[in-house]
């Protein structure tokens, strides 16, 4: 069955291929064979799949990578998230990943690394493995090639655990779909139904599933650099409205475009997907800019209200800086895939905890660390429950600041101009303001030469 799936994928490629493309792909396949020949463990296989297909997508589909924000997650991060979720499930709900009715969803599965590593983690007991695989693991992917790879990857991991002689079972928990589109319209589950008739049934089943855990690496791309890039992000009316209503209302900056970044949409969609009566856990590795950005104050305030506990492991790596600050931020977790700061965020919605605001725990990985050093630290910590990981309690101020809290002294200063024009009751220095000397014709009205200026003025 794995061969059949792979052959279907190859047939689709071959139907559109030309000789030049085939030659390039042949070289790619040769490199896969050479690198895979010496791999003898599950972690190594996952690592090579991530590295090869990350390189493949960047080379073959650069615009798709930019539009969808495709970056593949290091194994150390994946394992940290999986074990953190299991530990927090025990702490908050007295349940484990292995337990019945703990449905787990990876909404942006890519090559299926999160579900595959979950199967390989040993956290699912052998007696629960078949039930979990057949009924309680769910994944979505919108890129066709990645969808096929993920299906094969997950199926292969499951059958490796079963051993020889067991009947082959396909993984029916994966859907070829746009996660954000689910819930937008009643027809959303019909996506790709003509090509894949079973897909609609899978999407319908997933929408009915009582999801308790959502994990993954959501897309990051906020916007295209130019209209000519043809890499614009799709809008989602209902989801965008929810973001505007819940995350946008406390924002005082004029530019709130970053609130519609796909990773913020992922948090909003996932929050709405969890059932309020049962609660659950969301754990994403994502752009970490939301922790400090002024434009995300509404997002911070909202998750503080909607969840009972929040863990933020800041991996830093902001390379949209320069000089000493850039060196201090350290290596980029995703290498060349992203220049933004990265954070692992775990959100707990426990309906039994009656509190208006979440407890917030924060850990900064540290200064001047290389990418390899950061991944080594993540591997060593293993989970948010590790006592070696020293959490700092965060108590946001009324402005929604989590880090670098602003001083209220500025608000006591006398302003130069009134908030409202011509407000005679304003305690400002000036009541009236104007644009000053404003000609609308500066090239004609100013000149270093008195003679030339005189000529210009006489011609006006």
Where are these regions (language model features)?
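Sequence-level detector for compositionally biased, low-complexity segments
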Residues: 172, 227-228, 253, 269-460
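Long recognition/docking surfaces used for binding and targeting
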Residues: 1-61
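Eukaryote-specific, cytoplasm-facing alpha-helical/coiled-coil scaffolding segments in long proteins
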Residues: 12, 77-78, 82, 140, ...
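Alpha-helix initiation and N-capping motif
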Residues: 3-6, 22-25, 45-50, 115, ...
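Intrinsic-disorder/low-complexity, polar/charged segments
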Residues: 37, 41-44, 93-95, 143, ...
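Charged/polar, low-hydrophobicity segments characteristic of intrinsically disordered regions
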Residues: 7-31, 151, 371-391
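SAM-dependent methyltransferase catalytic region
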Residues: 44-45, 49, 56-312, 322
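Short alpha-helical "patches" and their helix-cap loops
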Residues: 2-11, 72, 97-102, 284, ...
